[in-house]
Every structure is written in C-alpha cells, then in structure tokens.
A protein has these predicted regions:
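Short, flexible, surface-exposed loop segments at domain boundaries
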Residues: 1-153
Length: 153
C-alpha cells in the first residue's frame, strides 16, 4: 500500500497555468506535487510557496500517493528549550520552544524527531519546524540547509 510522502525541502519552482488547470510544485530533492486548483487552500499555498522560494526556506509538504498535495506548511526557525517535562503524557511529549507562549507537542507518530530536538536543546542551534497550527503538534523538523541564514522567531 502506498503511503503519503512527506518532504521538507526548498522550493525550486511553482507552476500556475491559470484557468481551471492544477498547479505544480517542484522541490529541491526532485519531488513534484500537484496543487489542486479546486482545493480551498490553493491561493494560500501559492503565497506560502512564493515566500519560501524567495527566502530559500524549506516547506513541509505531504503528497498523496497520486502526487496531489495534501498539506503544505511553512517552516520557521525555532530554538528548542526542553523536550519532556510539564505537559508530557503517555500519548505525547511536551516541547518547550523559546519565547513560545504555549507548549508544543511531539506525538508517537513523529517520535523519530525526538533525538534531533534533544540535540538542539544541547547545542542551542535553531531547527526549522513545521507545526500543525490547531494542535501545536510538531509535524516536521530539520536543520537549516547549508548556507541559509536563519533567525529564530
């Protein structure tokens, strides 16, 4: 069974043919995803992708097995202060982000990110995070691409 492909890469191209045709997103690693024009998020995605392409920042993209984009989120540089502690439960690990008013969370389905987050606590180097806005769940994390100057928010 095919699974959703998740990529966190810089944008190399966004094609918007206009009319009622779907757009196409191209990422640095060669991934291409269809941007469904009928999707109510289409115009928001175009703005996110345009800004990311200009800045060189990676984006978080989840594509269905057929290649259609399901989720596109901007990534932001953040400094991780603590992994675990207050707010941690059996289902999710609390993550304290510098200057964030709320606790963020890492769930079991993204547990593989924990070592990267813990390393960032030790080094105090910023990570690029993709966060689900409604739940504050950390969906993706990576180190900034080589040569990209990032300022944590």
């Amino acid at each position: 069974m095919d699974e959703t492909k998740v990529v966190m890469e810089p944008v190399t191209g966004v094609e918007d043919p206009g009319g009622d045709k779907d757009g196409v997103l191209k990422l640095k690693d060669g991934t291409s995803c269809t941007l469904g024009r009928q999707d109510k998020r289409f115009s928001v995605w175009l703005r996110i992708l345009s800004g990311a392409q200009k800045s060189g920042m990676p984006v978080y993209v989840a594509c269905a097995p057929g290649g259609a984009a399901q989720t596109i989120l901007p990534m932001a540089a953040r400094t991780i202060e603590q992994v675990g502690g207050v707010g941690t439960t059996a289902e999710r690990t609390a993550v304290q982000i510098f200057m964030a008013p709320s606790i963020h969370f890492l769930t079991a389905r993204h547990a593989a990110l924990r070592p990267l987050l813990e390393e960032a606590v030790k080094t105090q180097e910023p990570l690029l995070l993709a966060v689900e806005p409604g739940t504050l769940e950390i969906l993706g994390a990576r180190k900034p691409p080589e040569g990209l100057d990032v300022t944590p928010i």
